[in-house]
Amino acid sequence: AQCYRKEGNYPKALEYYNKVEQAQPDSLNLALQIGQCLMALERYDEALAYFFKVEYLDKKPQNARRAIGWCSFITGNHQQAKKYYDLLISEPKPIMEDWMNAGHVYYILNETEKSIEYYRKAQELRGSHDEFVRLYQIDKKDLIKQGANEVDLFILPDELI
């Protein structure tokens, strides 16, 4: 399953993960991997079920929360995405992606000042403006699908300089 996943053959990886799941239904690591395959296949609602299971059962659910936040954002459930990214950035050491994705959510919710604040924190953790912009551009199509103004998306990174 992992070989297929690394090759990008998510349907085949999922087929094998599901077979392993029958033998190991309580494996949280397996549940995360199945959820990630489902995300790659854009089957977000199914993926969320796995991620919620991991969040509920795991002592350190940050990875599940990141996935829940992103699936929620992509499916237009921005309030739920906000809840999960707020949880992540309130942790002692949020990662750069937590700040960036929180920025995306707040931008879509028309809280531009907050989004700029969070993008700044992401940029600080990334170490350079150029590297931040490169990663920001990767998410541009997802932001547009969520209703972002394409012109704003070109201007927003300049606010961080």
PLM regions: where:
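Conserved structural position within tetratricopeptide repeats
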Residues: 19-22, 52-56, 86-90, 123-124
